[in-house]
Amino acid sequence: MAEIRVGKNETLDSALRRFKRSCQKAGVLAEARKHEYYEKPSVKRKKKSEAARKRKSFR
């Protein structure tokens, strides 16, 4: 989990923006969405294969 320390003269808005940015960099929301529901191993492999195929076609 992302953690920030609020400075003495820092507003709550700027602290919240920093927290959201650190969560985004850490990938907290993406990880939560990925584990939102169970995904069978065969489906995981299929998605991984499709992603690799898509990356390869861009080259």
From Swiss-Prot:
PROSITE patterns: RIBOSOMAL_S21
Keyword field contains ATP-binding: no
Keywords noted in UniProt: Ribonucleoprotein, Ribosomal protein
GO molecular function: structural constituent of ribosome
Intrachain S-S bonds: none
Basic residues: compositionally biased ranges: 43-59
Biological process, per Gene Ontology: translation
Cellular component terms per the entry's GO annotation: ribonucleoprotein complex; ribosome
InterPro entries cross-referenced by the UniProt entry: Ribosomal_bS21 (IPR001911), Ribosomal_bS21_CS (IPR018278), Ribosomal_bS21_sf (IPR038380)
Region (Disordered): 40-59
Name by which UniProt lists this protein: Small ribosomal subunit protein bS21
Organism of origin: Desulforamulus reducens (strain ATCC BAA-1160 / DSM 100696 / MI-1) (Desulfotomaculum reducens)
